[in-house]
Amino acid sequence: MSSTIFHTVAAAAPAPVSARYSHAVEADGWLHVTGQLPVDPERPDAPLPGDITAQARLCFDNLKRIVSHARYALDDTVFVRIYLRDFDADFAAFNRVYDAYFDDPQRLPSRTTVGVSRLGRDARVEVDIVLFSREKRATASQPHT
């Protein structure tokens, strides 16, 4: 039996402007969410916040908007990948924000954090996630709108 694949662009998240992509792709209970930069969806052309704490919060808030639009919950996250432009300077502060979004020590996703030399819009951080939901898998052929 072939699975249905759904592509999502959430109006509440920053619009894809630098490339063509879906905010998320869903198949068989899995949701792969495209990396999010710290862009304010209400003011997408505004300068990015300067500090890592504000940037990390914006990334996670954007991820939550996309996840919610696809009818998943952040608690369904099984994997997080983080790109930090200044690993040594930003790792600890980023982790404090991360801990606020993933606060149940019994349900922590797997995670990779990578130091990179540059990110789009000169952001300090970008985050992408993968989620899985048994309930969504059971209804995988029913599209969301």
Predicted regions located by residue number:
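N-terminal presequence-like segments and the immediate start of the first folded domain
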Residues: 1-61, 65-78, 84-145
